[in-house]
Design a protein with these regions (language model features):
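Sec-dependent N-terminal signal peptides
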Residues: 3-12
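Residue-level detector of transmembrane insertion/anchoring sites
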Residues: 4, 37-39, 186
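A broad, structure-centric signal for solvent-exposed, well-ordered loop/edge residues
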Residues: 8, 59-60, 227
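Single-residue recognition of alpha-helix boundary sites
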Residues: 13, 58-62, 206-207
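Sec/Tat signal peptide C-region and signal peptidase I cleavage site
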Residues: 14-18
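Alpha-helical substrate-recognition element adjacent to the catalytic core
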Residues: 19-43, 48-167
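C-terminal cap/substrate-recognition subdomain and adjoining C-terminal extension
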Residues: 20-29, 114-118, 127-261
């Protein structure tokens, strides 16, 4: 009898555990073809930087920020301290710079899924002080997540859900979404999360596993197939003239004629 009880328990555990799947795509069309007409109650969540858009200058690109943090860490600074130190400068650069859309089909996909009555929102590591510039950047590309009206209990002061964008104030994804899910009055049966970094996709998968939410994590690599924006030498020239951020083309011209000295 004990054997059969154990067997039944194991079978129940296996069938009741939410499914998890990780896929890699080159284009947003691959996401649409598989999930646009999914009847499940799901949330579709987009990362912001390098998924919805990327900085249009080497200096405003996320890779400059990441490489700068790495540089400080080689000097013995902790990752958190480097992030906190560089953030005000990164934010000032965002206010001066421009952005480039990754794929023109993304706004159309968002609108279609919203029109199906599904919840679609964005999730960024960005700090709360970056809310205004983030909203301006999204609006410039006609991207809106304001339809994502998710009733929740009071959120912790470290995170914010503003106009359909979850601001996590974190170096790595996961903790903010965990807090956000904790505050929800009802959870979805499935979460579809799109990010350009696989480690972020895996982190969100762990959050969903803890909540027993079915999960499809999508590693979105479209930006890798676009002409590169971040070029270290160009970023150095732009940093020299950062009081008024110049384009990559202007920086390349200065570099060619050695006028950056």
């Amino acid at each position: 009898m004990r054997f059969w009880l154990v067997l039944v328990f194991l079978c129940f555990s296996q069938t009741s555990e939410a499914s998890q799947r990780i896929v890699t795509v080159k284009t947003i069309h691959e996401v649409a073809s598989d999930n646009l007409y999914d009847e499940t109650d799901y949330w579709l969540i987009f990362d912001v930087d390098d998924v919805l858009f990327e900085g249009a200058e080497a200096l405003s690109h996320s890779l400059w920020f990441e490489r700068s943090i790495q540089g400080m860490r080689t000097l013995g600074t902790s990752e958190q301290e480097a992030w906190e130190t560089l953030y005000p400068e990164w934010l000032a650069i965002q206010r001066q710079g421009s952005i480039r859309q990754i794929e023109a089909a993304i706004p159309l996909l968002i609108t279609k899924v919203q029109n199906l009555g599904k919840t679609v929102f964005a999730y960024s590591e960005r700090k709360l002080c970056a809310q205004d510039i983030t909203m301006e950047q999204l609006a410039s590309l006609n991207l809106s997540f304001e339809k994502a009206l998710l009733p929740n209990t009071k959120l912790p002061p470290t995170i914010s859900f503003t106009k359909g964008v979850l601001f996590g104030s974190e170096i790595h994804k996961g903790p903010a979404l965990q807090l956000f899910l904790d505050a929800q009055t009802a959870l979805p049966k499935r979460i579809i999360y799109i990010d350009n970094e696989k480690y972020n996709v895996l982190r969100i998968g762990e959050v969903c596993k803890q909540k027993n939410i079915s999960y499809l994590g999508i590693v979105y690599t479209a930006a890798k197939y676009l002409p590169p924006i971040y070029l270290p030498d160009i970023a150095k020239v732009q940093y020299t003239f950062r009081q008024k951020l110049i384009s990559n083309e202007a920086a390349a011209l200065l570099l060619r004629h050695r006028l950056d000295k």
